[in-house]
Protein backbone atom coordinates (compact mmCIF):
# COMPACT_ATOMS: atom_id res chain seq x y z
CA UNK A 1 0.00 0.00 0.00
CA UNK A 2 1.16 3.54 -0.78
CA UNK A 3 1.79 5.94 2.05
CA UNK A 4 0.30 9.42 1.80
CA UNK A 5 3.72 10.87 0.94
CA UNK A 6 4.26 8.30 -1.81
CA UNK A 7 0.81 8.99 -3.22
CA UNK A 8 1.39 12.75 -3.39
CA UNK A 9 4.64 12.11 -5.26
CA UNK A 10 2.88 9.75 -7.69
CA UNK A 11 0.27 12.43 -8.43
CA UNK A 12 3.01 15.02 -9.08
CA UNK A 13 1.67 17.33 -6.37
CA UNK A 14 4.25 20.10 -5.96
CA UNK A 15 6.62 19.93 -3.01
CA UNK A 16 5.22 22.87 -1.05
CA UNK A 17 1.60 21.71 -1.28
CA UNK A 18 2.66 18.15 -0.42
CA UNK A 19 4.51 19.50 2.62
CA UNK A 20 1.38 21.34 3.77
CA UNK A 21 -0.88 18.31 3.27
CA UNK A 22 1.55 16.15 5.23
CA UNK A 23 1.57 18.73 8.03
CA UNK A 24 -2.23 18.62 8.19
CA UNK A 25 -2.16 14.82 8.16
CA UNK A 26 0.48 14.62 10.90
CA UNK A 27 -1.50 17.04 13.07
CA UNK A 28 -4.62 14.94 12.59
CA UNK A 29 -2.71 11.97 14.02
CA UNK A 30 -2.11 13.97 17.20
CA UNK A 31 -5.77 15.03 17.24
CA UNK A 32 -6.83 11.40 16.84
CA UNK A 33 -4.67 10.55 19.85
CA UNK A 34 -6.33 13.30 21.93
CA UNK A 35 -9.83 12.21 20.88
CA UNK A 36 -9.10 8.57 21.76
CA UNK A 37 -7.95 9.50 25.26
CA UNK A 38 -11.16 11.46 25.93
CA UNK A 39 -12.15 11.40 29.59
CA UNK A 40 -8.83 9.79 30.54
CA UNK A 41 -7.08 13.03 29.58
CA UNK A 42 -9.79 15.32 30.98
CA UNK A 43 -10.56 16.83 27.56
CA UNK A 44 -14.31 16.17 27.45
CA UNK A 45 -17.02 18.69 28.28
CA UNK A 46 -17.64 22.33 27.46
CA UNK A 47 -15.88 25.55 28.37
CA UNK A 48 -17.54 28.81 29.39
CA UNK A 49 -16.43 30.42 26.13
CA UNK A 50 -18.32 31.00 22.88
CA UNK A 51 -16.84 31.17 19.39
CA UNK A 52 -17.68 33.81 16.79
CA UNK A 53 -20.69 31.70 15.78
CA UNK A 54 -22.20 32.13 19.25
CA UNK A 55 -21.67 28.42 19.94
CA UNK A 56 -20.37 27.15 23.27
CA UNK A 57 -16.89 25.76 22.71
CA UNK A 58 -15.98 22.26 23.80
CA UNK A 59 -12.59 21.77 25.43
CA UNK A 60 -11.46 19.77 22.42
CA UNK A 61 -12.57 22.56 20.04
CA UNK A 62 -9.96 24.82 21.61
CA UNK A 63 -7.30 22.12 21.97
CA UNK A 64 -7.56 20.95 18.35
CA UNK A 65 -7.70 24.51 17.03
CA UNK A 66 -4.47 25.35 18.87
CA UNK A 67 -2.82 22.15 17.59
CA UNK A 68 -3.58 23.06 13.99
CA UNK A 69 -2.57 26.71 14.44
CA UNK A 70 0.77 25.75 15.95
CA UNK A 71 1.48 23.19 13.22
CA UNK A 72 0.57 25.58 10.40
CA UNK A 73 2.67 28.36 11.91
CA UNK A 74 5.67 26.01 11.90
CA UNK A 75 5.01 24.65 8.41
CA UNK A 76 6.55 27.51 6.44
CA UNK A 77 4.20 27.35 3.44
CA UNK A 78 1.16 29.05 5.01
CA UNK A 79 0.43 32.76 4.56
CA UNK A 80 -2.66 32.81 6.75
CA UNK A 81 -5.43 30.71 8.24
CA UNK A 82 -9.13 30.95 9.03
CA UNK A 83 -10.85 28.71 11.55
CA UNK A 84 -14.33 28.18 12.92
CA UNK A 85 -12.85 28.90 16.33
CA UNK A 86 -11.11 32.19 15.38
CA UNK A 87 -13.00 35.49 15.13
CA UNK A 88 -10.60 36.85 12.50
CA UNK A 89 -8.07 35.54 10.01
CA UNK A 90 -4.64 34.77 11.46
CA UNK A 91 -1.47 35.87 9.68
CA UNK A 92 1.17 33.15 9.69
CA UNK A 93 4.14 33.76 7.37
CA UNK A 94 4.86 36.65 4.99
CA UNK A 95 6.45 34.19 2.55
CA UNK A 96 3.67 31.61 2.65
CA UNK A 97 2.05 30.43 -0.58
CA UNK A 98 -1.20 29.09 0.81
CA UNK A 99 -4.25 29.99 2.86
CA UNK A 100 -5.81 27.28 5.00
CA UNK A 101 -9.43 27.26 6.21
CA UNK A 102 -10.48 24.60 8.69
CA UNK A 103 -13.02 23.31 11.16
CA UNK A 104 -10.73 21.73 13.74
CA UNK A 105 -13.35 19.43 15.24
CA UNK A 106 -16.56 19.07 13.27
CA UNK A 107 -19.37 17.46 15.24
CA UNK A 108 -17.80 18.31 18.60
CA UNK A 109 -21.22 17.99 20.26
CA UNK A 110 -20.72 14.23 19.68
CA UNK A 111 -17.55 14.10 21.78
CA UNK A 112 -19.25 13.53 25.11
CA UNK A 113 -21.24 10.57 23.73
CA UNK A 114 -18.20 8.98 22.03
CA UNK A 115 -19.61 9.39 18.53
CA UNK A 116 -18.07 10.47 15.21
CA UNK A 117 -16.11 13.71 14.90
CA UNK A 118 -13.60 14.95 12.36
CA UNK A 119 -11.38 17.72 10.99
CA UNK A 120 -12.25 19.49 7.71
CA UNK A 121 -9.77 21.59 5.74
CA UNK A 122 -9.47 23.64 2.56
CA UNK A 123 -6.31 25.00 0.90
CA UNK A 124 -6.42 28.15 -1.26
CA UNK A 125 -3.69 30.07 -3.07
CA UNK A 126 -2.44 33.12 -1.18
CA UNK A 127 -2.77 36.30 -3.27
CA UNK A 128 0.06 38.81 -3.33
CA UNK A 129 0.03 41.80 -1.01
CA UNK A 130 -1.20 42.46 2.50
CA UNK A 131 -3.13 39.66 4.18
CA UNK A 132 -6.72 40.64 4.99
CA UNK A 133 -10.02 38.81 5.22
CA UNK A 134 -10.56 39.69 1.55
CA UNK A 135 -7.55 37.50 0.69
CA UNK A 136 -9.64 34.48 1.68
CA UNK A 137 -12.82 35.42 -0.20
CA UNK A 138 -12.22 33.15 -3.17
CA UNK A 139 -14.79 30.80 -4.67
CA UNK A 140 -14.53 27.09 -3.98
CA UNK A 141 -13.26 26.60 -7.53
CA UNK A 142 -9.97 28.15 -6.41
CA UNK A 143 -9.26 25.37 -3.90
CA UNK A 144 -5.97 23.58 -4.47
CA UNK A 145 -6.72 20.78 -2.02
CA UNK A 146 -9.43 19.81 0.42
CA UNK A 147 -10.21 16.96 2.71
CA UNK A 148 -11.35 15.69 6.06
CA UNK A 149 -10.06 13.35 8.71
CA UNK A 150 -12.68 11.14 10.35
CA UNK A 151 -11.99 9.99 13.90
CA UNK A 152 -14.01 6.80 14.20
CA UNK A 153 -13.29 3.11 14.83
CA UNK A 154 -10.37 3.80 12.49
CA UNK A 155 -8.92 7.19 11.57
CA UNK A 156 -9.41 7.98 7.89
CA UNK A 157 -8.29 10.81 5.61
CA UNK A 158 -10.30 11.67 2.48
CA UNK A 159 -8.30 13.94 0.18
CA UNK A 160 -8.56 15.66 -3.17
CA UNK A 161 -6.01 17.77 -5.01
CA UNK A 162 -8.29 17.98 -8.04
CA UNK A 163 -7.37 14.48 -9.23
CA UNK A 164 -10.29 12.50 -7.85
CA UNK A 165 -10.77 11.54 -4.21
CA UNK A 166 -8.50 9.16 -2.35
CA UNK A 167 -9.08 7.55 1.03
CA UNK A 168 -6.27 6.78 3.46
CA UNK A 169 -6.48 4.80 6.69
CA UNK A 170 -4.17 5.43 9.63
CA UNK A 171 -2.26 2.26 10.49
CA UNK A 172 -2.48 1.88 14.28
CA UNK A 173 1.02 0.39 14.57
CA UNK A 174 3.13 2.25 12.00
CA UNK A 175 1.19 5.54 12.44
CA UNK A 176 1.23 6.03 8.65
CA UNK A 177 -1.72 6.99 6.47
CA UNK A 178 -1.99 4.21 3.85
CA UNK A 179 -3.99 4.41 0.62
CA UNK A 180 -7.04 2.14 0.97
CA UNK A 181 -9.26 3.51 -1.80
CA UNK A 182 -7.59 5.11 -4.82
CA UNK A 183 -10.79 6.40 -6.43
CA UNK A 184 -13.82 7.10 -4.25
CA UNK A 185 -16.94 7.33 -6.39
CA UNK A 186 -20.48 8.37 -5.49
CA UNK A 187 -23.20 6.32 -7.17
CA UNK A 188 -25.60 8.58 -9.13
CA UNK A 189 -28.72 7.00 -7.58
CA UNK A 190 -29.56 6.32 -3.97
CA UNK A 191 -32.25 5.36 -1.49
CA UNK A 192 -30.66 7.05 1.53
CA UNK A 193 -31.04 10.61 2.74
CA UNK A 194 -29.59 12.50 5.69
CA UNK A 195 -31.35 15.47 7.24
CA UNK A 196 -32.23 16.81 10.70
CA UNK A 197 -35.94 15.98 10.71
CA UNK A 198 -36.54 17.92 13.93
CA UNK A 199 -36.38 21.13 11.85
CA UNK A 200 -39.00 20.01 9.33
CA UNK A 201 -41.58 22.63 10.29
CA UNK A 202 -39.02 25.41 9.69
CA UNK A 203 -37.97 24.44 6.14
CA UNK A 204 -38.92 26.19 2.93
CA UNK A 205 -41.86 24.69 1.02
CA UNK A 206 -39.72 22.97 -1.69
CA UNK A 207 -37.72 21.02 0.89
CA UNK A 208 -40.85 20.17 2.88
CA UNK A 209 -42.42 18.67 -0.24
CA UNK A 210 -39.25 16.86 -1.32
CA UNK A 211 -38.80 15.11 2.03
CA UNK A 212 -42.52 14.32 2.29
CA UNK A 213 -42.32 12.56 -1.08
CA UNK A 214 -39.29 10.54 0.06
CA UNK A 215 -41.18 9.44 3.16
CA UNK A 216 -44.10 8.22 1.04
CA UNK A 217 -41.79 5.59 -0.42
CA UNK A 218 -43.17 3.23 -3.05
CA UNK A 219 -46.70 4.64 -2.82
CA UNK A 220 -45.47 8.19 -3.47
CA UNK A 221 -44.29 9.95 -6.64
CA UNK A 222 -40.71 8.65 -6.21
CA UNK A 223 -41.98 5.05 -6.37
CA UNK A 224 -39.22 3.63 -4.16
CA UNK A 225 -38.52 3.42 -0.44
CA UNK A 226 -35.88 5.59 1.22
CA UNK A 227 -34.00 5.16 4.49
CA UNK A 228 -32.97 8.12 6.65
CA UNK A 229 -29.55 8.35 8.28
CA UNK A 230 -28.29 11.13 10.58
CA UNK A 231 -24.99 11.26 12.47
CA UNK A 232 -25.20 14.94 13.53
CA UNK A 233 -21.67 15.58 12.26
CA UNK A 234 -21.27 16.70 8.65
CA UNK A 235 -17.97 14.86 8.39
CA UNK A 236 -19.63 11.54 9.24
CA UNK A 237 -22.65 12.02 7.01
CA UNK A 238 -20.53 13.09 4.03
CA UNK A 239 -18.18 10.15 4.58
CA UNK A 240 -21.16 7.82 4.27
CA UNK A 241 -22.20 9.57 1.03
CA UNK A 242 -18.70 9.20 -0.41
CA UNK A 243 -18.57 5.56 0.68
CA UNK A 244 -21.94 4.29 -0.53
CA UNK A 245 -23.92 7.15 -2.06
CA UNK A 246 -26.80 9.15 -0.65
CA UNK A 247 -27.92 12.74 -0.27
CA UNK A 248 -27.01 14.97 2.66
CA UNK A 249 -28.80 18.25 3.21
CA UNK A 250 -28.89 21.01 5.78
CA UNK A 251 -31.42 23.31 4.12
CA UNK A 252 -32.55 26.86 4.70
CA UNK A 253 -34.89 27.20 7.69
CA UNK A 254 -36.58 29.97 9.68
CA UNK A 255 -36.02 28.50 13.14
CA UNK A 256 -33.87 31.55 13.89
CA UNK A 257 -34.59 34.25 11.28
CA UNK A 258 -31.16 35.77 11.93
CA UNK A 259 -29.48 32.44 11.07
CA UNK A 260 -31.32 30.83 8.13
CA UNK A 261 -28.31 28.61 7.36
CA UNK A 262 -26.30 26.25 9.57
CA UNK A 263 -23.11 25.24 7.74
CA UNK A 264 -20.15 27.50 7.03
CA UNK A 265 -19.10 28.01 3.42
CA UNK A 266 -15.34 28.45 3.69
CA UNK A 267 -14.38 25.52 5.93
CA UNK A 268 -17.35 23.13 5.71
CA UNK A 269 -19.40 23.48 2.52
CA UNK A 270 -16.58 24.34 0.09
CA UNK A 271 -14.16 21.53 0.98
CA UNK A 272 -16.97 18.98 1.12
CA UNK A 273 -18.39 20.20 -2.21
CA UNK A 274 -14.93 19.89 -3.80
CA UNK A 275 -14.65 16.30 -2.57
CA UNK A 276 -18.18 15.42 -3.66
CA UNK A 277 -17.78 16.84 -7.18
CA UNK A 278 -14.42 15.12 -7.59
CA UNK A 279 -16.14 11.83 -6.67
CA UNK A 280 -18.85 12.35 -9.30
CA UNK A 281 -21.55 13.88 -7.11
CA UNK A 282 -23.10 17.33 -6.97
CA UNK A 283 -23.34 20.07 -4.34
CA UNK A 284 -25.78 22.99 -4.25
CA UNK A 285 -27.48 25.42 -1.91
CA UNK A 286 -30.79 24.66 -3.60
CA UNK A 287 -30.38 27.71 -5.80
CA UNK A 288 -26.71 27.80 -6.86
CA UNK A 289 -23.73 25.48 -7.10
CA UNK A 290 -21.73 25.75 -3.88
CA UNK A 291 -18.31 25.95 -5.54
CA UNK A 292 -19.44 28.91 -7.67
CA UNK A 293 -20.32 31.14 -4.70
CA UNK A 294 -18.15 34.20 -4.15
CA UNK A 295 -17.86 34.50 -0.35
CA UNK A 296 -18.69 37.76 1.42
CA UNK A 297 -17.00 36.95 4.76
CA UNK A 298 -15.01 34.09 6.24
CA UNK A 299 -17.77 32.83 8.53
CA UNK A 300 -20.53 33.01 5.89
CA UNK A 301 -23.18 30.29 6.19
CA UNK A 302 -25.03 28.56 3.36
CA UNK A 303 -27.65 25.91 2.80
CA UNK A 304 -26.19 22.58 1.66
CA UNK A 305 -27.58 19.84 -0.58
CA UNK A 306 -24.95 17.35 -1.77
CA UNK A 307 -24.43 13.75 -2.81
CA UNK A 308 -25.58 11.36 -5.52
CA UNK A 309 -25.99 13.38 -8.71
CA UNK A 310 -29.41 12.13 -9.80
CA UNK A 311 -30.86 12.57 -6.31
CA UNK A 312 -29.46 16.09 -5.98
CA UNK A 313 -31.05 16.87 -9.36
CA UNK A 314 -34.34 15.46 -8.08
CA UNK A 315 -34.16 17.65 -4.98
CA UNK A 316 -33.32 20.73 -7.04
CA UNK A 317 -36.27 20.09 -9.33
CA UNK A 318 -38.51 20.82 -6.33
CA UNK A 319 -36.76 24.19 -6.12
CA UNK A 320 -37.60 24.82 -9.77
CA UNK A 321 -34.01 24.42 -10.94
CA UNK A 322 -32.62 22.11 -13.64
CA UNK A 323 -29.07 21.09 -12.76
CA UNK A 324 -29.03 18.08 -15.05
CA UNK A 325 -25.83 19.30 -16.75
CA UNK A 326 -22.53 18.03 -15.41
CA UNK A 327 -20.79 20.48 -13.01
CA UNK A 328 -17.69 22.25 -14.27
CA UNK A 329 -14.84 20.87 -12.15
CA UNK A 330 -11.94 22.19 -14.21
From Swiss-Prot:
Q: Which reaction does it catalyse?
A: beta-D-fructose 1,6-bisphosphate + H2O = beta-D-fructose 6-phosphate + phosphate
- Superkingdom of the source species: Bacteria
Record note on cofactor: Binds 2 magnesium ions per subunit.
The UniProt annotation places Mg(2+) 1 binding at 84, 103, 105
Q: Which GO terms describe its biological process?
A: fructose 1,6-bisphosphate metabolic process; fructose 6-phosphate metabolic process; fructose metabolic process; gluconeogenesis; sucrose biosynthetic process
According to UniProt, this protein's pathway is: Carbohydrate biosynthesis; gluconeogenesis
| Subunit details | Homotetramer.
Q: What is this protein called?
A: Fructose-1,6-bisphosphatase class 1
Protein species of origin: Shewanella baltica (strain OS185)
Amino acid sequence: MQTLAQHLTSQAVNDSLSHLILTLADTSKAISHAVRHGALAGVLGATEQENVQGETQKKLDIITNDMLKDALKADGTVRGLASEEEDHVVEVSQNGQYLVCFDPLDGSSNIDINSLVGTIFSVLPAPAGELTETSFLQSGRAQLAAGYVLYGPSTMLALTTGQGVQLFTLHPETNEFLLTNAAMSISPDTQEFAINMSNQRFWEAPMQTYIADLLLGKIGPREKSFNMRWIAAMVGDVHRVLSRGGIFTYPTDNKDPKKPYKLRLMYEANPMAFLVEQAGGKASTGYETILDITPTHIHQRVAVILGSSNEVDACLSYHGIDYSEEPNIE
